[in-house]
Amino acid sequence: MRTLLLLAALFGCTSARADDAAGLGFDPYDQSKVPLEVQPPPDLKGQKIVLVAGSKSHGPGDHEFFAGTAVLMNLLKQTPNVWPVMARDGWPKDESVFDGAACVVFYMDGRGGHPVVKGDRLKKMQALMDKGVGWVNLHYAVDYEPKDGATVVNWMGGYYDPRTSINPHWDADIRALPKHPITRGVKPFNIRDEWYYNMHWVGDKPDVAEAKGVTPILQALPPDNTRGTADAKKYLGRIETVAWAYDRPDGGRGFGFTGGHSHRNWADEDFRRVVVNAILWCAKVDVPEGGAKVAFDPVDLNRNLDQKGKPFQKIAPAGK
């Protein structure tokens, strides 16, 4: 017993020292306070939005799906009459979480390991889409094998096709913004991330301008030396779309956002607002003229992180 007490004290002190050294005053890995799969009251007068975080991925500070989804949940709570419900590890434990959702959001690893394509889940999501439910994929979640992308493209208007799309890290200088509810309150910004581009667009169109129903939301000019696929190299000097909205023929809405690799980018107000606005728009919630409220304390970048087997390093906004 004495040995167990000593070990407990040792590990407790080690954790405390790590917290104190970072100057946080809290355990950055404590995820226990994040409410999971909490359903709204039966008399909810508003929209339920389901956010699904992927499992642990990449190194510290990157692909922080749990922490990033928790950030989004807290941001969405700042909009009246919205009830965000968060699930973890790629899929809800209780699939009834999806019942009555106005929008579903997936922030997770994609392609062959995409949680959405396992078993009969695509069919279950198709049933939601048939009801006009909104569809949002963030970062790696926009990446599908072509056999699955052929379905998802009809929900989102475009997807990352591993045969032709590309995923470099570069500084996206977002200058021109279209007039759209998603861009309300969003100012031009420049931010480094793993911005995917050269998407596979609905209708098998090579250019987003030809993709019916798709509105480019964020566009920037990538360095030509980032065009790592033969298809991407066909379009040297082309401004590329890194986030887009889709008005589905059935009246539903979709949104794809290729950023979100670097967790620190949630500290950027315009980065946050464009994603929150998009989720609200896909849920058919009126986006305020000045954009959604997205108040955020940068110290919260260090909350709810996944433990990834490396010493803790404080996450700060870019340039800090």
What role is predicted for each listed range?
Residues L4-C13:
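Bacterial N-terminal signal peptides
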Residues T14-A18:
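Sec/Tat signal peptide C-region and signal peptidase I cleavage site
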Residues D19-L44, V71-N74, Q78, D224-T226, ...:
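Extracellular ligand-binding/catalytic regions of CAZymes and related secreted enzymes
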Residues D20, G25, S57-N137, A141-Y144:
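Helical hinge/lid and interdomain linker segments adjacent to catalytic or ligand-binding clefts
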Residues D27-E37, D161-D250:
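Catalytic beta-strand/loop cores that center a nucleophilic Ser/Cys/Thr
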Residues P42-G46, K77, S96-G100, L128-K131, ...:
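Extracellular/periplasmic catalytic domains that process cell-envelope and extracellular macromolecules
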Residues K48-A53, W83-M86, A102-M108, M129, ...:
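Structural recognition of the beta-strand scaffold that forms the well-ordered cores
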Residues R111-P188:
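A glycine-rich, often tryptophan-bearing local segment used as a flexible ligand/cofactor-contacting loop or short
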